[in-house]
Amino acid sequence: MEKLTTELHSLSEMDRRHVVSILAEIANGYDDFNDMLIYLEFYPNHKILIS
């Protein structure tokens, strides 16, 4: 979780909100992994680890 927090701080405010909203949807039971994959495809330099 510390790694995720560190990586989120390196994102712009808009990107951070997008990632957090996707993670919230996943936590709420929505299988929105396609959005996560699309995000990672457009922003390949950002490493987002969920552990």
Swiss-Prot record:
Name by which UniProt lists this protein: Protein YrhD
Organism: Escherichia coli (strain K12)
Organism taxonomic ancestry: Bacteria, Pseudomonadati, Pseudomonadota, Gammaproteobacteria, Enterobacterales
